[in-house]
Amino acid sequence: MASQMHTSISSGDEGKDAVLKKERPYKIFFKDLFVFKENEIAARKKERMKNHSMKIYQKTTFSSRMKSRSHLGQLAFFADAGSSSYERLGLDPTLILRLTEGADRKRTVHEFINDQRDRFLLEYTVSTKKKTIKRFERLIAIKENQLKKAEKKLQDDALSFEEFLRENDQRSVDALKMAAQETINKLQMTSELKKASMEVQSIKSDIAKTEFLLKEYMKYGFFLLKLSPKQWQIQQSQKRAQSSKSNHILPKILEKFSINTAKGDNSIDSDKMSVSEEWSSRRGSQGGRHGKHTLGQDSRKSSGFTRPESMASEDSLEYFLEDELVEFDLLPEIYFKEPEELLQVFTELEEQNLTLVQYSQDVDENLEDVNKREKFIQDKINNNISFLLEHKHMLRMNCEREEEKAAELELRSRLFSFGEFNSDAQEKLIDSLSKKINQVYRVCIGDAEVGSLNAVQKLVKVESRLVELSDLIESIPREHVEAIERLKQKERRQKLREEKMKEKQRHQEERLKAALERAVAQPKKKLGRRLIYRSKPQSADKQELLLVSDTRSKSQDEEYFFS
């Protein structure tokens, strides 16, 4: 295979050299000397590059390649036939000579048969290769024809595409011209539309201005109609109704006008009555300090309310402004011919407004007085409520205190009645209590009715007197109360000190007396062993109930009331 590749490469190089020789006008003879060496170097380089590009399992060693080409050494018998046979077989004669230089000429029949077999195989392979080459040449020719046809078709397509491009360019140019013309037309149309819209806006603004002026003038006309007398208004409306019978709006206007005039008269009368009554009552309550002012105001008010009928019919044409602006053809007739008449009406209206302003000011003053009085009454009520709440809280605390006292007294009574009942001791205690109650009653209330009341009634009166005194103490300034309390505390402390001194002196006297008795008494002899505390019998001495006058421990209330 390598030899075949070498021969094909050499044949290709020879063909290239022949072409170059034909094309070149000069002939170089010394180059042919190095052709074989150059071809061999190129073949080795190509084979080396091929080995580099081959995969690992496709590569072979030099010995294996030489073994695969060992049959070439058996072709030495073709040397006598000349170099034409080697060329016909596609072999390189130089390679054959180099391989057959040291070959053995002696061969057997089997070797000859093998050589013939190999020759046949080689010829067969050569013939198959030639057939494949011819087939490939035919395919190449077919492909060349197809390529020529395709090239021709491409040329035709290119020509048609160029024609299409020319037509497309022409159409685009025409379209651009048409678009430019359309844009010009559009700009012209937009400019015309802008002009038309500006004209419309100006017309609308003029219409709005004229409508505004019309409304203002109609308001002025309605105002003048309001100031005109009612009879003249009715006459004008009847004239317009007769002149324009086709107009269906004027009868409704007349009907509404008559209703509004009737309502206006009634409202004016009622307003007069209510205002006069309120004015008289308010002025009567204020007294005679505003008498002159009242007369002046009444006179002005009477003059104001007896204005012409045109003044009293302010609401007679309210339907003109309440409804939308009615479109009707009316001749602009005015009742007032001279400006002085209108000025006179304005002066009357101004006087009426002044009276109303004065009346509103008086009403505001009265309202302010009423608000002040209401605020004062509300504050007084709030103070009374707070005082009553405090009094309620105080009464509740007093009730709780009295309940505690009652419970304490009940407990004391139980303790008092506990044990052996001694009527004499209780009678003595009750007598002492009644004496103390009489003393307290004389101190708190006086000597009157001392013998006619029992102890409970006296205690009730004393308690009521104490409540009154406590209320009076709350009304006394705090400084005086604190000064009195300090004096009382000082007296109480002085009394306690005196009692302590007396108690101490009495205790010393008792000690001295006991010491004298012990000194005088004979010594007692102790017989037997001393008893244990738990075995000591109770003393048979009974505790006597002490009287109130002999008690040294007093309650807090007794110290407060009797100190």
Swiss-Prot record:
Domain of life per record: Eukaryota
Coiled coil residues, start to end: 128-211, 361-415, 454-522
A GO molecular function held by the record: ubiquitin-modified histone reader activity
Signal peptide extent: none
Region (Disordered): 265-310, 543-563
Presence of the UniProt keyword GTP-binding in the record: no
Function: Essential for male fertility. Required for sperm flagellum biogenesis. Also required for acrosome biogenesis. Required for the attachment of developing acrosomes to the nucleus during spermiogenesis and may be involved in the transport of fibrous sheath components.
Protein name as it appears in the record: Coiled-coil domain-containing protein 38
The species this protein was found in: Mus musculus
